[in-house]
């Protein structure tokens, strides 16, 4: 661990000391979505969500009421409920499905010397506090992103059947295939997101299937037929990072949803216009596009004072490990988990892009 010493950060003496300049800040888009759960303390490290399968559904197809079969599948359900006079029907039972996620502890910590704290021209500890908040936001976004990328309902661009065979861009037919899958599984459009405040409150949004992906894909998304830019919405306020909608999709972009570099098919396999993009020029970069309906996943949000355990220890506090009180620290720890509650109420589209 590197301690922030007086010499580590060059000063600005004998120069006009300007403002502390703005720096890059992480986007938070996925962490505003999903069902927000606040798990009480001392209740275990394991979060268990439960649902009951509806009539006609199975564990393999928990959202579909009509099994694959020939004939009039709707009439099969009707006939199963015809009651004979004087005959008590056989009782049915309902089947629970439990989904489990273990909550994990995360932390970040900065250190600084007493000389930096007492003599340095800038308030280094204050800047550390600011960056702690931003760093927590970035880590949380990556926690959610990492979990959602593991969704089992995967689609691939350019006739691909795996990430390693992705060879094409996002196209309208691919979007429509995802919509068919979501609607067949009774995935409802998203209608609310976490409010932009340090709370668990939600705010209403215009309904749609929200699609989150990297800002590199903006050009090809805007080129989709039937695309409507966010600035031309008749009603409603676009979300942060939202560039527009195409049919049932609302597209939200962030530079903090990174691609899988060189993970796709060979560049020569590219099926789109021009040349496909590759970091090294060998295999196409693959961009996950996270598409979700309402209540597809849940997360223990890092919002509210109970979710973070901040630390600020200024120099001067003497202990056996620091007998002269020469070191100070600023940091925080927190607990978080992200759970996909219904794999088929969301999907991941894996695509490449044009160079």
Feature map (PLM): residue ranges:
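Exposed beta-sheet edge/beta-hairpin loop segments within beta-rich domains
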Residues: 117-127, 203, 315-324, 338
């Amino acid at each position: 661990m590197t301690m922030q010493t007086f010499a580590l950060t060059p000063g600005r003496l004998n120069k006009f000391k300007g403002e502390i300049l703005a720096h890059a800040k992480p986007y938070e888009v996925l962490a505003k979505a999903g069902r927000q759960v606040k798990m009480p303390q001392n209740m275990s490290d394991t979060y268990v969500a439960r649902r009951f399968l509806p009539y006609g559904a199975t564990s393999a197809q928990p959202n579909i009421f009509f099994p694959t079969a020939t004939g009039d599948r709707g009439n099969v359900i009707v006939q199963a409920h015809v009651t004979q006079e004087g005959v008590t029907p056989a009782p049915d039972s309902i089947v629970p499905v439990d989904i489990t996620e273990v909550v994990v502890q995360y932390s970040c910590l900065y250190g600084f010397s007493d000389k930096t704290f007492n003599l340095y021209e800038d308030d280094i500890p204050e800047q550390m506090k600011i960056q702690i908040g931003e760093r927590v936001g970035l880590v949380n976004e990556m926690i959610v992103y990492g979990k959602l990328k593991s969704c089992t309902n995967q689609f691939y661009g350019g006739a691909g059947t795996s990430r390693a065979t992705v060879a094409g861009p996002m196209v309208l037919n691919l979007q429509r295939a995802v919509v068919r899958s979501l609607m067949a599984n009774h995935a409802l459009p998203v209608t609310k997101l976490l409010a932009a405040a340090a709370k668990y409150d939600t705010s209403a949004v215009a309904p749609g299937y929200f699609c989150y992906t990297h800002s590199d894909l903006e050009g090809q998304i805007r080129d989709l037929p039937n695309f409507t830019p966010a600035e031309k919405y008749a009603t409603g306020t676009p979300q942060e990072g939202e560039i527009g909608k195409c049919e049932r999709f609302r597209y939200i972009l962030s530079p903090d949803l990174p691609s899988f570099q060189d993970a796709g098919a060979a560049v020569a396999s590219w099926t789109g216009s021009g040349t496909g993009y590759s970091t090294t020029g060998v295999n196409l970069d693959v961009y996950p596009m996270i598409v979700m309906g309402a209540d597809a996943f849940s997360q223990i949000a890092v919002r509210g004072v109970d979710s973070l355990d901040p630390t600020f220890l200024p120099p001067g506090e003497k202990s056996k490990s620091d007998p002269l009180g020469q070191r100070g620290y600023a940091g925080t720890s927190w607990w978080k988990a992200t759970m996909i509650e219904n794999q088929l109420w969301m999907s991941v589209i894996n695509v490449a892009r044009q160079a």
